[in-house]
Every structure is written in C-alpha cells, then in structure tokens.
Design a protein with these regions (language model features):
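Sec-dependent N-terminal signal peptides
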Residues: 6-8
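Surface-exposed, beta-sheet-biased, low-hydrophobicity segments with strongly acidic/polar composition
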Residues: 18-356
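Positively charged n-region of N-terminal signal peptides that target proteins for export
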Residues: 1-4
Length: 356
C-alpha cells in the first residue's frame, strides 16, 4: 500500500513540475477581419486607433489635442503631427508674459510646415516617433527650471470644411493661430505655462504621468486634458494625417498615413511581393513559420506609413503585405484592399488582417 501511495505522490509531483514548465500561450481573442476605419472622408478629419487582437477602435477629431506629455521616465513633450503644428525656441526670452507678436514676427516665418526648406524640420518632432532619445520640437524638459526655453507654437490648421474634388484630399483648413508655452518639471509631473501671443498673463496647469498610457494629451484651445489614445497595450495602429519629412525639402503633410505603436512595444515589417508572383496567393499562404523576427522594426512608427497606397493612381499598393507583432506577442498579416469608396472619394480605406 505504501508503494502505491509513493507512486501516486510521485506522479502528481511530476505532473506539477511539468505544468510549471509549460509555456503560457496567448491566444488572440479575434482571428481577423475586413476593416473600414472611420477616417471620415476627403478632409480626413479623424484619427483612428485600432487594436488588432480585439478588432476594436477609438476615434477622435484631429484638432482635439495640441500637446502630448510622455509617460515614461524621460520628460518629453510632443506636438500634434496631424494638424501641421510646429514649435520654435524664442531666443533670449525668460518671461512668458513679456513675449509679444512683435518680438517673434521673424520667427513666425520659419515656424511652419511644408515650406520646402530643409532646415524647417527642426520645428517638428522627429517623425520616426522616438520620443525617448530623438529630436522633438520642444526640447527635453530639464530638471533645472531656468534651462527650459519659451517656445512659439504654430497651432496648425483646422479641419477643411469646403468642397473637395473627387479623388483628392484636403488636410488643412483655417489657421488655428499662435501660442507661447513654457514647460518645466514639477516633481514627477510637468508644469505647463501657456498663453496667446499678446496676453500679459498666462495659465498654468500640472500634467501628471500615467504609466498605463504612452502620453497624457492636453488641449491648449480647450484648456484641459483630453482622452486621445487608448491605453498603450490596447492599440496597435493609428490611421491619421501626418507631418513627415521629404529628403532635402523639409517637413510636409501626408494623408492616409498609418502609424505603428512602437512605444507600446508593437513591431512591424513589410513584405514586398516580387513581380511575377500573385500577391493574393502569397498573402493567403503566409503562416507563422514564414515570419522573420529579426526584420520587425520597433524604432520607426512609419513602417507602414504611406507605403500602402499610390496617390497618383488612387489605388492600393497590392504588392505590400505587413507583418505585425503586438505587445502580447501575437502575430498578424495585413494588407490594404481599398483607398477610396465606390464614388472614388478619399478617406475611406479598407484593409484585411488575420492572426498567424
């Protein structure tokens, strides 16, 4: 009887050890879908944040936010890349209340997007999205208060409200004006000072970091924090208008752009199907064993960018297939199937994806 008990106990212990050693496998709650993100038409008024594992999204109008305060250990602040915002340091300024329009009249000419001058890239954030060590228009926020400059902020453009020719887009409407800002540290938080250019008093607000999110967003127009991105683990792709760079020509505004959530540990790479091969067949046959892990990019949010479409032919680039790995370690294959709707209007993209 004792021998039987020992065998039973030994078997139970072995099974327990094996269970402890089993690798936990994350199973996607959603296997894939055909998706039509709500960009909103030819003025592309919306940003859409999409989560592949659940086939869910959140949407906001592009001008709903102005500044993005980074939640990591670094103190970094981004500007709204979807509405042609720009920011430049006001040299010699030490008192935000004494800055006037007259003082910055020359700087206004420079702090612009799409001037086709190479050096204007200094007035936008590095489009790769590397907020930790990359360049931002507003410099890293120093622990020494006096080292934090006052910035002239071009507030960019409102959503265009007029008629748009079929097949075209209009990414910007009326100018949103100018502001002056200064940002310092307040313990583990940020202190934001801001005002209209000729105001002689300013507003102040404390912005706290929230580690569940990549950023805390703030609207200078509405004087409040705003909800924009989902929690950093709950989105993979962003569909948006975007301020990018043209080599040798500086900043420029791009429509139909797709960003990857690199800061939330989402990676991606593109497979370009060679001429002579059927892209649909290649897509259908792609499986997890075909993934090349070393090609996944985590340091450039533009891996998809505008490479999925051809604006001149108003069609998708059918040769491009995208491999995406989300923050839970799930893999997806994705391709775009439409740039316009049946009326040939822009701002109605479609894509399909499947879990690998």
């Amino acid at each position: 009887m004792k021998k039987i008990l020992l065998v039973i106990i030994g078997t139970m212990m072995l099974q327990s050890c094996l269970k402890d050693r089993e690798e936990k496998i994350t199973v996607a709650p959603f296997e894939g879908a055909i998706v039509e993100p709500n960009i909103g038409g030819s003025a592309e008024p919306n940003q859409v944040w999409f989560d592949l594992s659940t086939n869910t999204h959140t949407t906001n109008e592009r001008p709903k936010w102005d500044l993005a305060f980074y939640s990591g250990k670094e103190f970094r602040v981004g500007i709204n890349y979807s509405i042609m915002m720009a920011a430049g340091k006001i040299e010699g300024a030490t008192d935000i209340d004494k800055v006037t329009s007259e003082m910055v009249s020359d700087l206004k000419e420079d702090v612009q997007v799409a001037t086709f001058t190479p050096d204007n890239e200094r007035y936008i954030d590095n489009p790769e999205g590397n907020y930790i060590s990359g360049r931002t228009a507003i410099g890293e926020i120093s622990a020494t208060e006096k080292d934090n400059a006052i910035y002239l902020v071009n507030m960019g453009k409102e959503i265009y409200k007029g008629d748009i020719e079929k097949g075209s887009v209009s990414t910007g409407g009326d100018a949103r004006g100018w502001m002056k800002v200064q940002i310092t540290r307040e313990g583990s938080a940020y202190k934001l000072k801001y005002a209209k250019l000729d105001d002689t008093t300013h507003k102040e607000v404390i912005i706290h970091k929230n580690p569940q999110y990549n950023f805390t967003f703030f609207s200078l127009k509405d004087n409040k924090e705003v909800n924009i991105q989902p929690e950093k683990k709950n989105w993979d792709l962003c569909f948006t208008v975007f301020t990018n760079l043209i080599p040798g020509a500086g900043s420029y505004i791009y429509s139909d752009f797709v960003l990857v959530n690199n800061l939330g540990n989402v990676g991606a790479y593109v497979i370009s199907v060679p001429n002579g091969q059927n892209a649909t067949e290649v897509y259908n046959k792609l499986s997890k064993k075909d993934i090349e892990e070393n090609k996944l990019s985590y340091n450039d949010q533009r891996t998809i960018g505008g490479s999925w479409r051809d604006v001149f032919s108003k069609s998708v680039n059918a040769k491009n297939i995208y491999i995406i790995k989300d923050s839970d370690g799930l893999y997806y294959k994705l391709r775009f199937t439409r740039l316009t709707n049946i009326k040939e209007e822009r701002g109605y993209p479609q894509f399909e994806y499947k879990t690998l």
